[in-house]
Amino acid sequence: MSKGKEVFLNEDIRAAELRCIGDDGKAYGILPREKALEVAYQSGLDLVLIAPDAKPPVAKIMDYKKFCYQQEKKLKEAKKKQKVIEIKEIKFSAKIAQNDVNYKIKHAKEFLDDDKHVKLRVFLKGREIATPEIGVNLLNKIWDEYFEGNATKEKEPIIEGRYVSMLVTPKKV
């Protein structure tokens, strides 16, 4: 159960009459609270209030600790199945040599082959900040020459202060 939601068990239930459901799904019908508690204790289980707003409130006879354990297991299993997206960043300067571009693109392609997202950033220095189009043009040129057809452009080149950034993701097969 979630931590924010308060759960009423056994004697904590204040309703005079309850619609009871057994652990196996069997419906006991509408019972007085004392009778429902008696049935739960006889079977060695807990009486758990499931729907307090219903008329009459719905309670289930079950092993509460076992139920909580199963809920935790489901949450852990769901967490395991989540895929963490790793983003690698490669920085360029606006006046980068072609040889250096080739070297950095080689690494970017390796990251994409490993199913990682790659953020390409052009760092603008000094007077280059006045003309961020240089960075946009460089990223577009890199995209056209190296990645088009091999990857997906998640974000177009955008200007973020001193940087011009573009996000490239592996192509979905």
Curated annotation (Swiss-Prot):
Keyword Zinc recorded: no
Major place of residence: cytoplasm
Top-level taxon in the UniProt lineage: Bacteria
Localization: Cytoplasm
Annotated Gene Ontology cellular component terms: cytosol; membrane
GO molecular function, one term: translation initiation factor activity
GO biological process: ribosome disassembly
Keywords assigned: Cytoplasm, Initiation factor, Protein biosynthesis
Assembly description: Monomer.
Family statement: Belongs to the IF-3 family.
Function statement: IF-3 binds to the 30S ribosomal subunit and shifts the equilibrium between 70S ribosomes and their 50S and 30S subunits in favor of the free subunits, thus enhancing the availability of 30S subunits on which protein synthesis initiation begins.
Name by which UniProt lists this protein: Translation initiation factor IF-3
Higher taxonomy: Bacteria, Pseudomonadati, Campylobacterota, Epsilonproteobacteria, Campylobacterales
